[in-house]
Amino acid sequence: MDATTIDLEQMGRAAKTAAMTLGQLTTLQKNTGLLAMAAALETHADTILAANKADLAAASALPEKFVDRLALTKARIADMAAGVRQVATLDDPTAQTDRAWVNEAGLTIAQKRVPLGVVGMIYEARPNVTVDAAALTFKSGNAVILRGGKEALHSNLALATVLQDALAAKELPRDAVQLITDPSRAVATQMMHLNGYIDVLIPRGGKGLIKAVVEQATVPVIETGAGNCHIYVDAHAQLQMAVAIVVNAKVQRPSVCNAAEKLLIHADVANEQLPVIAKALQDHGVELRGDERARAIVPSMHAATAEDWDTEYNDLIMAVKVVDSEEEAIQHINAHNTKHSEAIITDNYQNSQQFLQQVDAAVVYVNASTRFTDGYEFGFGAEIGISTQKLHARGPMGLAALTTIKYQVLGNGQIRKN
């Protein structure tokens, strides 16, 4: 159900009805729907590209990195379809029993995974999120209400229509996937207050969007992360490894949330290693902003401000700080990070364990790039987002994160005696 004059409660009722049906589908039925959606994306690629062309024309004055995320090609649509097919191969969490036991009264208690119900998504101008969210929610037995960025409205509408038609052709609920076509903030705010219809709301986008949803929503929210990610080069770090990891984490895709934004380096190795790491970054076009001690070693750095330590750049910019101890590095990270992904480079086992235990983040790495924080890399398949909160789900969220627990208890007439 789509509407130009939005009746969100009507959409919510339709989603609830669809969710009841989805919760009863077999894994085979859900996979059939997913394969139909994947095929439809490929069949209707020209229609989707025409809609995307309209969005791109309106966005021509926006920054290049924004336009790149918005743009679709036949290859990107093929990748979307492949992603949907890959979701079809994943284990269905709702077909599993987590554990079962018999209690002292003879009751058989089974802990099962069940769908959340209706998932709401508020996200920026990334058409791929429309498809990823539809595939993951459908496989996990949830209905989804999507509200994408206004810059991608034509693309999202084309994609949602293709997915809905594919489901309907297989006699599956069309309202399993619904798109809000009014991009106004007023409607977004109304969506955030759709208690009784939306079971959980997941924002995906920049810090401002996520902050607005977390602060304004009255429905439960899973906070997905802005990524102010750090790499700490310990006193026992191998230089070659440090260069490779830092460059990969910063340069490969600087606009994504798992890119590194800050470099901390121990004073004992800073004079030797920082000039080499800095040159490698600068050779890739990275602007470095250092504290006073870092600039004394690499004078070409710009001066870092207090604001820099809390900024997610999403760009080829990195702030650098020299620290005197691992404890200082950990304190700095915990004071300024967004609880997303943090890494230490070290050959010292004790230091690695201290970092793993004391850094407060969804994902903590030893001798690896923060770029691995991703559903595919973790073996979850596509992800609905990367949670930086601690309740319900944390880190890359795959299918299991879109379910909750139900206890099924079987008896033969037992009554409680006390």
Swiss-Prot record:
Recorded metabolic or biological pathway in which this protein acts: Amino-acid biosynthesis; L-proline biosynthesis; L-glutamate 5-semialdehyde from L-glutamate: step 2/2
GO molecular function, one term: NADP binding
Gene Ontology cellular-component annotations: cytoplasm
Domain of life: Bacteria
Protein location: Cytoplasm
PROSITE patterns the record matches: PROA (PS01223)
Coiled coil: none
Gene3D superfamilies in UniProt: Aldehyde Dehydrogenase, Chain A, domain 1, Aldehyde Dehydrogenase, Chain A, domain 2
Function noted in UniProt: Catalyzes the NADPH-dependent reduction of L-glutamate 5-phosphate into L-glutamate 5-semialdehyde and phosphate. The product spontaneously undergoes cyclization to form 1-pyrroline-5-carboxylate.
Protein name in the entry: Gamma-glutamyl phosphate reductase
Source organism (scientific name): Lacticaseibacillus paracasei (strain ATCC 334 / BCRC 17002 / CCUG 31169 / CIP 107868 / KCTC 3260 / NRRL B-441)
